């Protein structure tokens, strides 16, 4: 059994086993982010859904108002003038069949792949390469579109795709630990509002089960769900 480091033991003792209010929890998250790099702020939300049923699945996107704190590398598969349009809009890579061939060879130096609709038949063969990495373009995630500029702008600003896993848990980042508490709170509230707005139609009764946040190397901190949800529904 792996030994728990003294650093981990020390920070774990600072977290009480109770729901925290948002600002209090975020201050604690920042205090306990003591790694030698800027940690990511993560949210882990357990929902009372059974994703084996189509009407209880949750998969959607949102734009974090304060961004992710991460530099997103974007590749675009398009043709003709759309390639120049993509590069002018800030794409890091853009091409047609040449880019597809590079991806087939394992060149995946990007975080998000956007494609124009006319290129989807050609991209279909990349399913085995992109699918397991969550990089396959799809209309639902906003990565298949003719409006290349808008898509690039949104993902550069902090657009994320999230889904509930087979256990009904949503795992999503909401910034970096060097963000201000106010900015982290704004992003976290956006996450909560998006999950409520996109409540699956098949869910009856209670929806939220638990709401935890943590930093990359930090302990889990339980949030008071009612504090966030009351702001929306009061």
Swiss-Prot record:
Principal location class: plastid
Any one cellular-component term (Gene Ontology): chloroplast
Gene3D superfamilies referenced in this protein's UniProt entry, alphabetically: 3.30.190.20, 3.40.50.790
GO molecular function: rRNA binding; structural constituent of ribosome
Subcellular location: Plastid, Chloroplast
GO biological process: translation
UniProt entry tagged with the keyword Plastid: yes
InterPro entries associated with the record: Ribosom_uL1_bac-type (IPR005878), Ribosomal_uL1 (IPR002143), Ribosomal_uL1-like (IPR023674), Ribosomal_uL1/biogenesis (IPR028364), Ribosomal_uL1_3-a/b-sand (IPR016095), Ribosomal_uL1_CS (IPR023673)
Annotated keywords: Chloroplast, Plastid, Ribonucleoprotein, Ribosomal protein, RNA-binding, rRNA-binding
Record's subunit section: Part of the 50S ribosomal subunit.
Function text: Binds directly to 23S rRNA. Might be involved in E site tRNA release (Potential).
Assigned protein family: Belongs to the universal ribosomal protein uL1 family.
Protein name, UniProt field: Large ribosomal subunit protein uL1c
Organism: Rhodomonas salina
């Amino acid at each position: 059994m792996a030994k728990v480091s003294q650093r981990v033991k020390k920070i774990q003792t600072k977290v009480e086993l109770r729901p925290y209010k948002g600002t209090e929890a975020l201050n604690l998250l920042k205090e306990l982010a003591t790694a030698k790099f800027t940690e990511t702020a993560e949210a882990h939300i357990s929902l009372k859904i059974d994703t084996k049923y189509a009407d209880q699945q949750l998969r959607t996107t949102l734009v974090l108002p304060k961004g992710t704190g991460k530099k997103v590398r974007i590749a675009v598969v398009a043709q003709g003038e759309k390639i120049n349009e993509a590069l002018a809009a800030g794409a890091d890579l853009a091409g047609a069949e040449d880019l597809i061939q590079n991806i087939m060879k394992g060149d995946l130096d990007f975080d998000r792949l956007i494609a124009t609709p006319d290129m989807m038949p050609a991209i279909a063969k990349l399913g085995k390469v992109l699918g397991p990495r969550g990089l396959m373009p799809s209309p639902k995630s906003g990565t298949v579109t003719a409006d290349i500029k808008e898509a690039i702008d949104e993902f550069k600003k902090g657009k994320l795709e999230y889904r509930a896993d087979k256990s009904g848990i949503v795992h999503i980042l909401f910034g970096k630990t060097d963000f201000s508490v106010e900015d982290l709170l704004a992003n976290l509230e956006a996450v909560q509002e998006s999950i409520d707005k996109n409540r699956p139609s098949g869910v009856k009764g209670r929806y939220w089960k638990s709401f935890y946040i943590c930093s990359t190397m930090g302990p889990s901190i339980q949030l008071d769900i009612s504090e966030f949800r009351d702001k929306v529904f009061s």
